[in-house]
Amino acid sequence: RAAGLDVRGVMGYEGHLMMVHDRDAKREKVEAAMAILLRAHELVGGDIVSGGGTGTWDLNTWCTEIQAGSYTLMDTQYDELETPFEKALSVLATVISVSPKGWIIADCGLKALGMDHGNPSWDEGDVFFCSDEHITLMPRELSDWKVGDRVRIWPAHVDPTVARHEQFWMVEGDTIRDRWPIDLRHW
């Protein structure tokens, strides 16, 4: 230890295990990862053993602090896991074009969505393509859509999606309840 350094604990993150679907395999791998972190804790001391995440929160019984953050907003990737959490973050876009060939275009794309975990999802049909500023959607019923309609897009990864925006709009149904600024942008 360096002179004058006040160690409060250790922090690890078994991020490579978040999306393991086999619960028994995940439990075994979390235990192995935490054994390494607990050994580091023995060496440096402190009160805090920080680790875990949204994908391992219920299996990680070794940490004194769980780092789960995505659970508050969820995304389409974490939604694939069996968790008690529901998606809460979406990007609201406006339909700007309706093609008679069966698709619609809305005004959100790569610059509005975190795409590192794949395509976003849409409850009313399929996401066909995302360009920088637009998303091409294949609705189940094309006749239901017109220019100016709103579409709710569910991001595949909430963290980089949040970093692309200035504020959250808290909505309940069609009512805006509050607006929260986003401090950390462009990370």
Spans of model-derived segments:
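Active-site loop ensemble at the mouth of alpha/beta enzyme cores that anchors a bound cofactor
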Residues: K26-E28, G55-E124
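Generic secondary-structure boundary/loop-capping signal
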Residues: R8, E14, C63, S70, ...
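Noncatalytic linker/hinge segments flanking ATPase motor cores
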Residues: V7-H21, G46-G52, E86-T94, D107-G114, ...
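Conserved active-site and cofactor/substrate-binding residues in soluble primary-metabolism enzymes
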Residues: E28, A32-I36, K87-S90, D132, ...
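Residue-level signal for the start and early helices of compact helical domains
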Residues: A2, R8, W62, E82, ...
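C-terminal accessory subdomain/extension
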Residues: S99-W187
